[in-house]
Amino acid sequence: IGTICIDQQHPDTVWIGTGEPWTRNSVSIGTGIYKTTDGGEKFEFMGLAKSERIAKIIVDPSNSNNVYVAVQGALWSDSEERGVYKTIDGGKTWSRLLYVNPSTGCASLAMDPNNPQVLYAAMWDHRRTAYDFRSGGPGSGLYKSTDGGANWTKLSAGLPEGTIGRIAVAVSKVAPYSVYALVESEKSALYKSVDNGANWLKMSDQNAMGERPFYFSNISPDPVEADRIYKPGFVLLVSNDGGKIFQGASTEGGAYHSDTHAFYVSPKDNRFMYLGTDGGVYVSRDKGNTWSHCENLPVAQFYHVSVDMQKPYNVYGGLQDNGSWKAPSSNPGGIQNADWETIGIGDGFNAFADKSDPDLVYWQYQGGRVYRSNTKTGENKFIKPFADATTEDLRYNWNTPVHFGKKSNWLYIGAQYLYRSKDKGDSWERISGDLTTDNPLRQQQEKSGGVSADNTTAENNTTIFTIRESALDANVIWVGTD
């Protein structure tokens, strides 16, 4: 699910847009737009089946039958079902209001709170392949309509020239003539218009304005204080001078998880706000100075799970951006949050117990960083293999395969080569040549990203991705590579 919109005139009516609009290489594809009219008891499919990613839904506050949808569209290919769509009959039929080209979708959509006929649409030209990402192109731009989407004008006065990437647009609820645009460009920055988008002034080009725009393109004016602006990103930033200077919002404790993607401030009392992060949902009752974690939402994502041979057996798993964990499979009072024990940090991936010594646990985080931990003594040892003087740099996948052979009790890890350890990771031997395609065109991560480079191990390619030792013959080993 990429976006949710509640009909403020009929709160039991909720619109859901599917598909992830934050376009990493692991995003999910949606199946269109859905609606419930009974508070979520039943949902009805309302169309846009080929949209793949819906970034925003806006219900006209003066007429609930009028709904606007920002369709970001396909990530991996051209597609025609993208742009700005509108229904005037509650979703029975749809018309496309704004379209640029097959590689450009609508990544952000905003409505003037005082005039529902005025809309701002941020169009984004982008494409991802299996080995590369391009943010930006001739299709990107910011558009405005004053007649409910029937006609559009491209806005440019004061906005950066050259190649534009992703844009986030927002209109101040307390000062509707003030419009904000977070623009990815050669020097990404926050821009502000005080004349309804006719002219723009650069407010801030702090580094945080350009941090991973495909992942953190979000700007949120406070609904009560005209000069207070929030910028979610790696952390939540706030400006109290209309967007000139940003600093961390949390100043008095109550930490929250990093990577903030969703944000809401109550228009009735702006002390109350909600923050969606890689660690779940947080709530603040003091403008973000302190935060409380909503611990009753089971929204963690496991990469891998395993079990040991204890009685009762234990379950091990690695969580997306939330470390590695261990818990018993049964408990007289049932399994509770308190039964889970943390064993590792970072993005947790493979986590499993040693077959011959149950006190030893192996866990890893991104890029092949593997550890062996002793649960009795608390000792942690970093056991990742490194290249020697005769070997080029190793290419480890974001989700590096680590395997414990059932037949041999040997440990395996894959980069572009396969490594084996017969002493629980204390030493390693390389037992293969390069098993990947070793295609240099698929190893240019430093050039990937388009307007903004995105050089992280999340995009490492031509690597070993999975390993299995035969359960019958330890000399037979299978690997999967690209």
Placement of each model-derived feature along the sequence:
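Beta-propeller blade termini and top-face loops
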Residues: 1-482
